[in-house]
Amino acid sequence: MATPIATTTNTPTKAGSLTIAGSGIASVGHITLETLAYIKESHKVFYLVCDPVTEAFIQENGKGPCINLSIYYDSQKSRYDSYLQMCEVMLRDVRNGLDVLGVFYGHPGVFVSPSHRAIALAREEGFNAKMLAGVSAEDCLFADLEFDPASFGCMTCEASELLIRNRPLNPYIHNVIWQVGSVGVTDMTFNNNKFPILIDRLEKDFGPNHTVIHYVGRVIPQSVSKIETFTIADLRKEEVMNHFDAISTLYVPPRDISPVDPTMAEKLGPSGTRVEPIEAFRPSLKWSAQNDKRSYAYNPYESDVVAQLDNYVTPEGHRILQGSPAMKKFLITLATSPQLLQAYRENPSAIVDTVEGLNEQEKYGLKLGSEGAVYALMSRPTGDIAREKELTNDEIANNHGAPYAFVSAVIIAAIICAL
């Protein structure tokens, strides 16, 4: 059985908590149901977002005071000083016993300094603290530019970090460079006069004629994502430099395709695997000079596989959704209510006893408080259902691996696609 990784050396002992969440990039639409639940249930919300629509949404849904952290930015002080103050104002309310939520645009752990500091300090002081996942600019970039980081690999790095630590750029993989419009900037002036230093580095590793893409994800409903294609030599032109600002990202596609190591391929390759379908899955290098502009039309192999759909029979091992309406409703509510989830974790039996409409097996499984029991009850093989096979309490209690079968299949598929 896997051992959970400890997120703190101190068991929370004090009233008050800190949750850090992300608002995503696209206004309001990227706010997750989980984050929305915390906005509605937290005593106080602090936010640092990049558009007025998201700010309005937070204020309309927060039950308590909603404070804009951008007031701590000032052109006369460093960003680091601003981040220290943002962190501290959140912690003061946590220390006063409040359940505090901090909302930062994008993913709250990506290019966000005060979020990590606040969580670390809160835990050291004995408070419960955690981070919720959010939609990052990188997620938007993958969608808008339509490339898969699992194919060929991907390196991401902040522009100043790339230069000052001489991080390697790999011409065989996808390279994503963040904050290229504020190279070497530590305050709020965002003067990009160090941008040519980055261009020198790109030209050294990729040459002046390699294509790069300037990217900025869409934010408010009226906006569209900015996707501009230049050569590295183009970046030296003043009119091109003026396109870049503090939120600009640069995507540098692979220049060459890395050769396959035949010895390693033989060791890793599954017996009998056909090369054709593997190559068909591998996406073309849309933005690269190596783009083979492959067609996704049906070749003989693909046509044969598609034709099998006409007589397809669902395999017996396929799992389908089960569970009473009461169980489905309870688990959906549990997933979208932080307060109910906390109460359930503290005493599953007490919460389950308040739920009407559950059958005895569902009550038993839910009182165990384990994910395996939920999968055992709600995801049943078609063969078991056809035979009207009843689950035993031991089967419910001892189910541990069911949720990972599908995930494993997806991971294996991704590996095959990357070959």
From Swiss-Prot:
EC number: 2.1.1.-
Spans annotated as Precursor leader: 382-404
Chain positions covered by the region annotation Methyltransferase domain: 1-255
Keywords: Methylation, Methyltransferase, S-adenosyl-L-methionine, Transferase
Pathway: Secondary metabolite biosynthesis
Residue positions of the active site: 79, 83, 105
Chain positions with N-methylvaline modification: 410
Residue numbers bearing the N-methylserine modification: 408
Transferase among keywords: yes
Pfam families: TP_methylase
Post-translational modification: GjuMA automethylates at Ser-408, Ala-409, Val-410, Ile-411, Ile-412, Ala-413, Ala-414, Ile-415 and Ile-416 before being processed by ae prolyloligopeptidase which likely forms a peptidyl ester upon removal of the follower propeptide, which then undergoes macrocyclization with the N-terminus of the modified core peptide. Peptide backbone alpha-N-methylations change the physicochemical properties of amide bonds to provide structural constraints and other favorable characteristics including biological membrane permeability to peptides.
Location of N-methylalanine modifications: 409, 413-414
SUPFAM superfamilies assigned to the protein according to its UniProt record, in alphabetical order: Tetrapyrrole methylase
Biological-process GO terms, alphabetical: methylation
Positions of the UniProt region annotated as Clasp domain: 256-381
Domain notes: Within the homodimer, the clasp domain wraps around the adjacent subunit to position the core peptide into the other subunit's active site for iterative intermolecular methylation.
Family: In the N-terminal section; belongs to the precorrin methyltransferase family.
Quaternary structure and partners: Homodimer.
Function description: Fusion protein of the methyltransferase gjuM and the type I borosin core peptide; part of the gene cluster that mediates the biosynthesis of a type I borosin, a highly methylated cyclic peptide with potent biological activities. Type I borosins derive from the C-terminus of the fusion protein, and it is the same protein that methylates its own C-terminus using S-adenosyl methionine (SAM). The C-terminus is subsequently cleaved off and macrocyclized by a prolyloligopeptidase to give the final product.
Protein name stated in the entry: Methyltransferase/ribosomally synthesized type I borosin cyclic peptide precursor gjuMa
Phylogenetic classification of the source organism: Eukaryota, Fungi, Dikarya, Basidiomycota, Agaricomycotina
